[in-house]
Structures are given as C-alpha cells and as structure tokens.
From Swiss-Prot:
NCBIfam families: YggS family pyridoxal phosphate-dependent enzyme. The keyword Lyase does not apply. The gene is PLPBP. InterPro entries: Ala_racemase_N (IPR001608), PLP-binding_barrel (IPR029066), PyrdxlP_homeostasis (IPR011078). This is Pyridoxal phosphate homeostasis protein. It comes from Bos taurus. The lineage of its organism: Eukaryota, Metazoa, Chordata, Craniata, Vertebrata.
Length: 273
C-alpha cells in the first residue's frame, strides 16, 4: 500500500515523481472515453519545503509547482538558485487569496496561474493589479468552488459559479478563465461510489459549457490531491495538486513566519495536497 510521503522520503524525489507520473498514466488509461482526452497537469505542491527540493524536482523534469501562502511563494519564486536553475518553472497559487495580498502575489516571478478566484471583488482586484504589471500575457485563473459546503473550505457556492465566470470573461480583460477548482471533503470512501464533490464540479462544467457554448476541453478541472488524485483523474480531472507523495510529509511546526491572515483552517492545512 502506497503511503503518501513515505516512499519519497526513503527513495528520493526523482523516484517519487516517476511513481506519481506512472499512477497518473494508469488513471488516464481507466478514464472513460467520453471524457476529454486531456493529459492531466501535475502540480507539485512544495509548501513548507526548501528551495533545493524544488530544484531537485525540476531536475527530474517537473515544471509546474504550487504554493498555498503568498509570502512563501514570493520568497521561493524569487530565490536566486531557483531563478537560475529553473528557467522554465511555472508557479500556481492554490491557497486562499485575500485582497490585501494581491499586489504581493502579482510580484511573483514566473506566476502562471491563480487557481482560487472566489469572488467578483477578488477578480477585479487581480485584473487591475495584473494590468498595472504590464504583462503581455493574460493571467490564467480558475474559479474555486466549495463543492462540499464545509465552513472550513474556501470557494464560492456552486450556484454563484456561472455569474463569476461570466464577469471574468466580460469585465476582466487581463485575466484568462481556464477552469474550475475544488478541494472537496477529505476521506471519501470510494466503495460508496464516486466522490460527490468531484461530481458536483463535473456537473458545473457541463452547465457552464452549455451557457458559454464551449466544448468541455476548454474548461479545465482542478481536483485531486495526494490521497485521491487517481480517482479524480478517472472522473475527469485535468489538474492534480500533489505534495506529500512527492516531497514527503510536512513539518508545520517550523512554519511560524506566516501572517495570521494567510493561515487556513486547521483541517485544510493538515490534509490538503
């Protein structure tokens, strides 16, 4: 039985990445043919991990990395060793973003995607900040949905999804809407059937594609973490966020420098990715 973090800690990041990518391909092979034939993107979540681990993962072919905290992402992405050793690195921000931290996030080198837009006000703030940055490319964004309805999870209610996406498309010219993201409830028993939170996100994509007149291939789904990424891919995820299975278990006792405004609910911190 694979235990998240155990094999990576014992045998190294390169071994762990190969094993994860093999499991990704196994899940793709089990995916129903009526789902979009999109190769899932692996986001290596490096929160609490040092720069040398990012560089090691990059040396083994990993290009996309994710972080949950703005300050940690800014420090890591600005690290001179990462900048020199990882010229093609792409950073995804996957944590809760408060409006007062938007300008700091926009300063992150090689920021590729913001996966957690959850309000019109946040979308407008990010759009304005990205415009001021003067980037020639639009910033890719996903809309985060709270599919489980848990108070400890961020994201907007499913019923508000379409209005926010339409606002981004119509009023945020510096942003490129690319998909939907969810965390979902933890510990779902697959013997009881597919994860209902993932099913909600699939249904929302169907609804959105009807409204936009767009094929499902144009709306990504970011769902699935270390404990459930294979199931997520099997039901349609195109973006999985995996941390401890690649980098080993995290030691949160050493992360005491995060502002209180950036701290997530305890359950989300302990179990996500």
């Amino acid at each position: 039985m694979w235990k998240a973090g155990s094999m990576s800690a014992e045998l190294g990041i390169g071994f762990a990445l190969r094993a994860v990518n093999e499991r990704v391909q196994q899940a793709v092979a089990r995916r129903p043919r009526d789902l979009p034939a999109i190769q899932p993107r692996l986001v290596a979540v490096s929160k609490t991990k040092p720069a040398d681990m990012v560089i090691e993962a990059y040396s083994h072919g990993q290009r996309t990395f994710g972080e949950n905290y703005v300050q940690e992402l800014l420090e890591k992405a600005s690290n001179p060793q990462i900048l020199s050793s990882c010229p093609e690195i792409k950073w995804h921000f996957i944590g809760h973003l408060q409006k007062q931290n938007v300008n700091k996030l926009m300063a992150v080198p090689n920021l590729s995607m913001l996966e957690t837009v959850d309000s019109v006000k946040l979308a407008d703030k990010v759009n304005s900040a990205w415009q001021k940055k003067g980037s020639p490319e639009r910033l890719k964004v996903m809309v985060q949905i709270n599919t489980s309805g848990e108070a400890s999870k961020h994201g907007l209610p499913p019923a508000e999804m379409a209005a926010l996406v339409e606002h981004i498309n119509a009023k945020c010219p510096s942003l490129e809407f690319v998909g939907l993201m969810t965390i979902g409830s933890f510990g779902h028993d697959l013997s009881q059937g597919p994860n209902p939170d993932f099913q909600v996100l699939l249904s929302l994509r169907e609804e959105l594609c009807r409204k936009l007149g767009a094929p499902p291939e144009q709306v990504e789904l970011s769902m699935g973490m270390s404990v459930d990424f294979q199931h997520a891919i099997e039901v349609g995820s195109t973006n999985v966020r995996i941390g401890s299975t690649i980098f080993g278990e995290r030691d949160y006792s050493k992360k005491t420098d995060k502002p209180a405004a950036e701290l997530q609910a305890p359950e989300e911190v302990a179990q996500a990715h």
